[in-house]
Amino acid sequence: MSYHNPPIPWRELEGRISGRPAPHGHQESHADQVGYRHVRKPFDRHPVRPEGPVVPYAELHCHSSYSFLDGASNPEDLVIRAVELGLSGLALTDHDGLYGVVRMAEAAEACGLSTIIGSELSIGVPEPQNGVADPVGSHLLVLANGPEGYRRLAEALTDAYLVEGGRKGRPVHDLDHLAEVADGHWTVLTGCRKGAVRQGLVKGMLQAEAELRRLVDLFGIDNVLVELTDHRAPTDSRDNDLLAELASRHSLLTVATTAAHYAGAEQFELACALSAVRARRSLDEMDGWLPPGPVARLRSGAEMADLFSRHRDAVDNTVAVAERTAFHLKSVRPRLPDQKVPDGHTPISWLRHLVEEGRRACYGDDPVAKDRLATELDLIEDRGFAGYFLIVSDIVEFAQSQGILCQGRGSAAASAVCYVLGITVVDPVFYGLPFERFLSVLREEEPDIDVDFDARRREEVIQYVYAKYGRRNAAQVADVITYRPRSAVRDMAKALGYSQGQQDAWSRQMERRSVPPLPHDPDGPEIPDDVTTLAQQVMGLPRHLGIHSAGMVLTREPVGRICPIEPARMFGRTVLQWDKEDCAWMGLVKFDLLGLGMLSALSISFDLISQHCGRFWTLASIPRNEPGVYDMLCRGDSIGVFQVESRAQIGALPRLKPRCFYDLAVEIGLIRPGPVQGGAVHPYIRRRTGVEPVTYPHPLLEPVLERTLGIPLFQEQLMQMATTVGNCTAADADLLRRAMGSKRGVERIDSLRTKLFEGMAANGIDDDTAQGIYARIESFANFGFAESHALSFAGLVYTSAWIKLHYPAVFLAALLRSQPMGFYSSATLVADARRHGVVTRRPDVARSSVGADLELLDACCEELGSEELETGIDECLHDHDESEIGAFDPNRDDGDHRRDTHFAVRLGLSDVSGINIETATRIVEERERESFASLDDLARRVDLSGEEVEALALAGAFDDLVGSRRGALWQIGQINGVAPGQLDVQVVTQPPLLPEPTQMELLGDDLRATGISTADHPVRQVRDALNRRGVVQVDRLDGVETRRRIEVAGVVTHRQRPGTAGGVTFLNLEDETGLLNVIVTPGAWRHYRRVARTSRALVVRGILERGDEGVMSLQADRLEALDLSVPTKSRDFR
């Protein structure tokens, strides 16, 4: 469910979290509000057509921003402008693709505008043309004649990209092949100045006539139109007269076009800037290639009639062409592929068979489960969705057969069918999850089943899908990469001719969730107004096409006949030209095959435990309800633990004190932007801690809200509230949930509201109470989290916490091998593990694996068996009952849980910056054949570049082999020229007596080479100076009184400004003893912006705040840069 919540000021946010009322009458300034967040919403604009008669005209040649840097208006804006101009129709003809047609069709459907779909094809292009001021080759403008013409155009584009020689940015079109595919279903225009006919005019009428005759011979005389355009170039009028003469000679119609590249004159400067970006030149360098004014804008019929007064029939002809070619895009919606089932079965009968097998295994003879499954299957059969479930089940079954960890997430966990098929792991019958949250009788489209896979092995699953369904019937969904603040500022500064250094400096000042500052903004970064003006305009326009992280589309007919397919930059992948919203609007079924880093980490953990400790664990066999796991979480000790490791979650854990599995689901659902904005956090915590009694809006709602202490948190509770007190059906309740989360759901809400109030009255609920219940449902609808999703993730929270508690060395190695993932950098994970007694060692060519691994702490451990190597108490080896957990006692010593005490973590060779997995693998494989005798021995046997050898030396990977880092760096000059296989002849020179590096120098080398300090922390190196200043260590804050002004110093690990924080920025400071959350108000951020934004480490002065459970933070009033002389990195505004 999407959120449509407005930004709230900090004072109100703080009041909602703390429970204290905000100051009465205070109004926050605009500067306190959150910045930019791009969300595509349904088209909801209402342009007004001109009054009175208009000159009929349809624009047949128009480029949107989906011509990627060759159009300055989004398709929706072009539709709006076309309606306001009174056009009879609008064609979208972007370069070599149908990228923007769904957006245009959606907007046109809402506005009642007739639309034509086409594309301007690039002919004779030897390579991608970005970086070229005037791209080579010629253009062929194609309009699809109805649905069949559209399918053939999509097919032709797919062929051009997937044919041998075709690649991203360079389709290979062959005119003969295009004519064969078209087979009379296209209307071909001769094009603008890049059209072959108009280009032929440069060489004379004979050449132009030859090009025109060729088009007629290929596509047919009834399907070729001569295009007239006038961009006020000196030769345009003469060229149009000559083209009209050619058309008359060959009995062809002429059509007048604008060859538009933007909606209105106000986009002209932006269009020029985008052209400069595409050409990789400045605007000054583009002089001569750009038009003199806003000539490529949409024009009204009256303007076109005036412009083409000598060729008025060319204007009139456009309307008949539009009527002949226009169609509704949704008419080409495809169907799912047929799933093969055993002989004698249909898809639904086979699904029922599989479900019955799963029911016996999961539920036995439980009548409640049996009835629930029967209800779900009946609805699945009625909606014709059996094939969808079989496809997902088959993909999951393949992954499980290959040992790939996977599990479904989201609303699918509310389906008992998904549960017994093994797609999800949450029992919806046990938790009472309503199936209608996942699929209801009022839902027409297929349900949405998202499945998480081990991120390392997700590619195997994707390639299985390609292999099973074929490259023409399966493709990944696109991700349209749009301009964000940094790229907007960088590209516009580049177009305006500013230096590379200026571009970099200004773009770095932009934060991920901000917007480029308005011109003359005194509080904004120091960026020139001409840059910010254009950056504001370009925000949100598409920059290039990427690939969606998870979505795949499968169709019965070739999907390339619905949407063109092109190669992705990633090897072995192909991608559609549409994003997920486009696919959804068109009814293409998307299968989300997500890669989850935590599943990778858990899979690696199980492998490491098995390999080094001899113990075999799986997701299913991890003992449940272990008190020690919940005790660890109650202490807020959750760095690295799935979903509960952010500073907000760590701060909430000691207050919520989770003592059972469901508490973990509540933690996941509660600490979210929505519940904070909805005011649910503090009331729940007050009730959880016994400060406030648990009450219910009405006794009938106690069964619904009991599990969340009378506070609605989950979307499923909204539905259950509506069915319990309002006598709504479950389908009505789901419709109410979706309507309340949509700006377009007002009419639906009104009808359901009446039904809900009638039901409450029938249940004897008085009007005041009913109004209160409805207000609670209404305010909660915008922020509720899916309970099914929270429960799915809660299992991974528990499992990752269990491994962190019992096998912290294993957990660290697994997290390092699964990067990038999670909230923290590798350096912070290592520092946290060090505080838990885990020893981490540098990479070593003689000992390291490819990735992080375990090794015994000392040689004496090698004599121990696997049972002796496992340490710690044994209560983790069996399940516990929830009744055994009891209340959390922070003073209780519950024993040593660690079972991998004899092991250290050895960083992998691939952890060294500049050493990829392939290189690390070669080193390990060669070492396993025979140990390396010396550095030059390694250089001869492994094909390493000089940069790779230096990177390993800087990381200390040769220390044992050579003796020191400086000694290794000295030897590199002798071996860089030695190739693999050369004779063992070397010149030996005595290295100079080099001084030993200082600890700070070694620390700097570590951080530069791996980003990780294995033995020390940067702040420890300046601790003496900080102590003399009175700066307090994080681990000593317990002894500092609340509300005292103090100074704390540390490395900045994160900078965050959540959308719910009203402009407040949160910093995480890390010293050698721990982490502290720093709160920077908008005023303080403005005052110290440069220091706060750019400093790698800070000394922060502020007021120490302490929550009810001792959770501490520092409210900053002064920030000062701390020079550590070593490189550190932070994760900013993610």
Curated annotation (Swiss-Prot):
It catalyses: DNA(n) + a 2'-deoxyribonucleoside 5'-triphosphate = DNA(n+1) + diphosphate. Keywords: Cytoplasm, DNA damage, DNA repair, DNA replication, DNA-directed DNA polymerase, Nucleotidyltransferase, Transferase. Its main location: cytoplasm. It is found in: Cytoplasm. GO terms for molecular function: 3'-5' exonuclease activity; DNA-directed DNA polymerase activity; nucleic acid binding. Signal peptide: none annotated. The keyword Nucleotidyltransferase applies. Pfam families: DNA_pol3_alpha, DNA_pol3_finger, HHH_6, PHP, tRNA_anti-codon. The keyword Zinc-finger does not apply. One of its GO terms (cellular component) is cytoplasm. InterPro entries: DNA_pol3_alpha_NTPase_dom, DNA_pol3_finger, DnaE2, DnaE2/DnaE/PolC, DNAPol_HHH, NA-bd_OB_tRNA, PHP_dom, Pol/His_phosphatase_N. Residues 1-33 are annotated as: Disordered. GO terms for biological process: DNA repair; DNA replication. Its EC number is 2.7.7.7. SMART domains: POLIIIAc. Belongs to the DNA polymerase type-C family. DnaE2 subfamily. DNA polymerase involved in damage-induced mutagenesis and translesion synthesis (TLS). It is not the major replicative DNA polymerase. This is Error-prone DNA polymerase. The lineage of its organism: Bacteria, Bacillati, Actinomycetota, Actinomycetes, Propionibacteriales.
